[in-house]
């Protein structure tokens, strides 16, 4: 008999699964900073979704799978009239909040946007709450939503710290699926073993490729992939709730496990245990709807636009621009050639620098075809060169710094070289929180005004900006405030 014949004995669960489940079921969040940051992250994320409702490319994807479907006690989709089953509501909310690339960001060996998990969290919490009320039970409070956000951020972010999925061609939404599955399963009241099963189901799924994020195939799926992942998480948690079995060595199984099939045989590495680190250090996009590796470059470009104007010059006088940057920026958004759609443009650092140099602004509308057709943009793009500075790459990976630096040097047609403008930390960085939060609140006010009349805006603001009041509010009551 061959000694290579595999044993059919069921193994113990992989330690990675155990650690995730122990964290969501046993860890008590005591960090006031994490809860406060989660509240700010919540309102910013919802505001991003409200702004996306102005874009038909997004709204065409929203609503029930089958038109006319009615779901008793369904979950509300903020800013719409939809009440949907939690799976489809998670997709709707997740697609909205990610559509314009304006919600939070986590940068490490893997990149991502942990607030994408809010799709599954909010849909499930609202659906549970409405069904609890119908059964004469208490609804969940918004504090439960904030706690789930903190834990989902932590799971996604801690795995991302040392493990690069992009290096093997996988999209980071796999981590949204895993994190959402874990916290949603806990929210649904699954047992520890059932949550283990649910998380294993998330890992055993075929995972999304990064094809839709890169030339020559960059496209709009990158705007709804996160909704798809968090929606799938709710579905898997509900499947596990039926008692469906899991796959305990889904990561480590020889030949057939995630590591061997999709991760070049390498096990995950971890920098730190799960706690509240990620939420406390999350990057908030405050100023510009731009891929985060370009945020500081856009800020520098805005400064240069002002400096040129003061000198009586303009972008027309620019002969060349050098962007001194970090390796991740080069890998993700350094892009030449034609840009065919908004998803292509908001992942091109040359485009995101050219627009503010020309116009003194960068808004979501600037990625649309009408603006992109201006020939001055591509002409200026062609004069921009990116170069890696190893020191900036080291600072990017340094846990004590976590900078996302870009430095712009402009050479004018007459040979004049302007002083380099270096921006190390974007406005939404932890090191600039005090400066950023008032502007984040203003961003939320602006997004509320896009969708609601003044009285409704004020009611939402009053609830959202008061930490204690928000935490105590039933989830269904809070989401009812966003109905139209």
UniProtKB/Swiss-Prot annotation:
It comes from the Bacteria. NCBIfam families: PRK09425.1 (NF006943), prpD (TIGR02330). One of its GO terms (biological process) is propionate metabolic process, methylcitrate cycle. It is an enzyme of class 4 (lyase). The lineage of its organism: Bacteria, Pseudomonadati, Pseudomonadota, Betaproteobacteria, Burkholderiales. It catalyses: (2S,3S)-2-methylcitrate = 2-methyl-cis-aconitate + H2O; citrate = D-threo-isocitrate. Pfam families: MmgE_PrpD_C (PF19305), MmgE_PrpD_N (PF03972). This is 2-methylcitrate dehydratase. Its EC number is 4.2.1.79, 4.2.1.3.
């Amino acid at each position: 008999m061959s000694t290579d014949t595999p044993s059919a004995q069921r193994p113990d669960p992989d330690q990675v699964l155990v650690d995730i489940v122990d964290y969501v079921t046993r860890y008590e969040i005591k960090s006031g900073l994490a809860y406060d940051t989660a509240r700010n992250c919540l309102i910013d994320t919802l505001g991003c979704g409200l702004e996306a409702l102005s874009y038909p490319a997004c709204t065409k994807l929203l609503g029930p799978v089958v038109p006319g479907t009615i779901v008793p006690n369904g979950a509300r989709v903020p800013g719409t009239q939809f009440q949907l089953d939690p799976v489809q509501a998670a997709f709707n909310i997740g697609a909205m909040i990610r559509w314009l690339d304006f919600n939070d960001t986590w940068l490490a060996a893997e990149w991502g946007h942990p607030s994408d998990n809010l799709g599954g969290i909010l849909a499930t919490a609202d659906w549970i709450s409405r069904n609890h009320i119908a059964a004469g039970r208490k609804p969940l409070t918004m504090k439960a939503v904030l706690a789930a956000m903190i834990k989902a951020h932590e799971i996604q972010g801690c795995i991302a710290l040392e493990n690069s999925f992009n290096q093997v061609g996988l999209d980071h939404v796999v981590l949204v699926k895993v994190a959402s599955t874990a916290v949603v399963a806990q929210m649904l009241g699954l047992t520890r073993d059932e949550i283990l099963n649910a998380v294993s189901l998330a890992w055993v799924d075929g995972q999304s490729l990064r094809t839709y994020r890169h030339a020559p195939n960059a496209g709009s799926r990158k705007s709804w992939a996160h909704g798809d992942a968090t929606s799938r998480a709710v579905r898997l948690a509900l499947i596990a709730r039926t008692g469906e079995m899991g796959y305990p060595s889904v990561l480590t199984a020889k030949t057939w496990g995630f590591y061997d099939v999709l991760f070049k045989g390498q096990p995950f590495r971890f920098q730190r245990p799960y706690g509240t680190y990620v939420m406390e250090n999350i990057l908030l996009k405050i100023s510009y709807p731009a891929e985060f590796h370009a945020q500081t470059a856009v800020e520098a470009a805005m400064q240069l636009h002002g400096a040129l104007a003061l000198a009586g010059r303009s972008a027309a006088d620019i002969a060349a621009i050098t962007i001194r940057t970090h390796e991740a920026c080069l890998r993700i958004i350094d892009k030449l050639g034609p840009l065919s759609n908004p998803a292509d443009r908001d992942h091109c650092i040359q485009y995101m620098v050219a627009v503010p140099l020309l116009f003194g602004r960068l808004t979501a509308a600037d990625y649309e075809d009408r603006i992109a057709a201006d020939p001055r943009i591509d002409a200026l793009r062609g004069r921009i060169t990116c170069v890696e500075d190893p020191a900036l790459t080291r600072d990017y990976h340094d846990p004590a710094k976590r900078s996302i630096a870009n430095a712009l040097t402009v050479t004018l047609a007459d040979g004049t070289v302007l002083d380099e403008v270096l921006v190390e930390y974007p406005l939404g960085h932890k090191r600039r929180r005090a400066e950023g939060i008032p502007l984040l609140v203003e961003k939320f006010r602006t997004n509320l005004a896009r969708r609601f009349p003044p009285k409704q805006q004020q009611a939402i603001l009053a609830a959202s900006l008061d930490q204690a009041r928000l935490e105590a509010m039933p989830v269904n009551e809070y989401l009812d405030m966003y109905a139209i």
